Amino acid sequence: MTGKQDQDYKEETGMKNPFTALFRARDKPQDSVSAAPLFYFGTSGAGKSVTAQTAIQLSTVYACVRVISETVASLPLGVYEATDQGNEKAQDHPLYRLLHDEPNAEMTSFVFREVMLAHLLLYGNSYSQIIRSGKNTVVGLYPLLPDHMDVDRDSKGNLTYTYTTSDGKTVVIKPQDILHIPGLGFDGVMGYSPIALEKNAIGLGIASEEYGSKFFSNGARPSGILTHPNTVKNPKAVRDSWNSAYGGSSNSNRVAILEEGMTFTPLSSPNNEAQFLETRKFQVDEICRIFRVPPHLVGNLEHATFSNIEHQSIDFAVHTIRPWLVRIEQSMNRALFTEQEKGRFYVQFNMDGLMRGDYKSRMEGYAIARQNGWMSANDIRALENQNPIPAEDGGDALLVNGNMILVTSAMQSRAEDATRSTTKTDNRKGG
């Protein structure tokens, strides 16, 4: 069947390219009720509505968001240029000052990146407006609230960004003027909120915390009660007196004293208390699992030891922080550089400080590098934030252990030694 016959056959039978439907299915980014899966919205299984605002009030969520966002914000971020001599800092590039020091007139680089990560962790997406000069040079970056942004596609399939300001006005921003960093998502365009995806786990944490608060504020259990042998004449008076005397955490464990022949009955439920505490402990680990944060970084030292905390921290840097850094770097490289600059300039975080081990391990590593000739004294001093040694004093010299030689040189040396030994023996015989 020829190409024309094939086309005629498709038109007659109504067949279409099977991939067309796939592309149409992802035309609208999945950030709205009509496009997002049903599990994305609604209350949690514990009956609690989970939003970014309610979730951040849970101490474990706040601690996880804070430790990730502050760690990323504290890492040095710079612009580099790939040259024939290697990769060098491009401190003269306009983006260097924006990313390293001050992205706009209202905030520092630390605050900007901290906000950016908080948006990613709570909403699944980070948006920043790119301000350019008349020469198309980036002169400012301003973070935008993710829950005020609507992302869609126009009739031509191009992405559109519509932002709703605090006074209710809508502003359409061109895609080239938006630094959009998506988190984990299903369509490659929009990220999903970890809070919404894991609403059941977080909702259970909110419910258990609310239960504990209400228990101690309104229903603190006394150590015992007295029962009346007959019908109580004025239940309301007894109830009001009870709440006044034994309600609230300050009155917990007091013995209830009533009159008219009442008998004392101890009241205790240690099993329920233990289960409640276990539930709260489990939810701490569960929420840490969502954000991939070691529990000891949020104050849970139950399973931490002096020998494993360092390795857990390095694991946090490798498996939690680094993926976020790569996601941010690639999004910035795509959105902030011109087509002529891409491939030559790039954005990169410096993770050296985060990956540093204890002092003894660092010194042993430096010694190996120094003795094997692939680090100079100044290379080591730079990593330890110390001033360099002048080059004339050997600060940039590369040294190797004098006992280490090439295998071929060793074989040649042995052959020469054997020759000299034979010559000496012959001379003695001849003498």
Predicted region positions:
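Structured, contiguous alpha/beta core segments that scaffold functional sites
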Residues: 2-276, 280-289, 293-296, 300, ...
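Short acidic alpha-helical/loop segments enriched in Asp/Glu that coordinate divalent cations
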Residues: 295-305, 330-343
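Small-residue-rich helix-loop
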Residues: 309-310
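Generic long, charged, amphipathic alpha-helical segments
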Residues: 335-357
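Short, amphipathic alpha-helical "recognition" segments used to contact nucleic acids or chromatin
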Residues: 365-370
